[in-house]
A protein has these predicted regions:
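Class I SAM-dependent transferase core
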Residues: 1-96, 100, 112-116
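Conserved nucleotide-cofactor-binding alpha/beta core module
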Residues: 76-179
Length: 179
């Protein structure tokens, strides 16, 4: 069985994104043109356009495209701003953010995901800085150094309001996560 990824991408945009209020035309355009499957390890490639959460071995997961792109859309217009992405996974959101901004810092805890992320950067799929910090270390820091970021995206849900992030963010920073 050989999967037609181009058709899968088109179906994702039509049936998942457009049908569920992803309306930002420049965001959709970038998504339509990016071969998301190239970010996935071979054993997960067939799930690149799935509308399900993909659970991995180390208690981490990949959000479904619709959820990821709702978060990106919630960031509003992205110019070449300084962006922090927490829980970067395989780089599925990073790759699209990078079409708008070249100033992206990322945090990921999973060694499996970090390896895939670094390989994708080596392959030229996107460009970002992977910070030497785990997600847990970031959230346990009472005074995270995040003043420089205009936008912060947390690819996951939080049990409580991220007070330390809010207190230490720049005045006009936009912060999005799943509640």
């Amino acid at each position: 069985f050989i999967m037609n990824f181009e058709q899968a991408r088109s179906n994702m945009v039509l049936n998942q994104l457009r049908a569920n209020r992803i309306k930002n035309s420049s965001l959709i355009e970038k998504i339509e043109l990016f071969p998301r499957e190239n970010l996935y390890p071979k054993s997960y490639k067939h799930l690149a356009y799935s509308d399900k959460i993909i659970f991995l071995d180390d208690s981490r997961f990949i959000l479904p495209p619709l959820t990821s792109f709702h978060l990106l859309q919630a960031l509003g217009e992205i110019d070449d701003e300084s962006i922090l992405e927490i829980g970067s996974g395989f780089g599925t959101s990073t790759s699209i953010i990078n079409k708008f901004s070249s100033n992206i810092d990322c945090i990921e805890s999973s060694s499996q995901m970090t390896e895939v992320f670094k390989n994708s950067m080596k392959d030229g799929l996107f460009n970002a800085s992977l910070l030497d910090l785990t997600i847990e270390e970031f959230f346990n820091n009472k005074k995270p150094n995040i003043k420089k970021y205009q936008k912060i995206i947390i690819n996951g849900s939080l049990d409580e309001e991220p007070i330390n992030i809010i207190k230490n963010a720049s005045d006009n920073a936009e912060i999005v996560c799943i509640c």
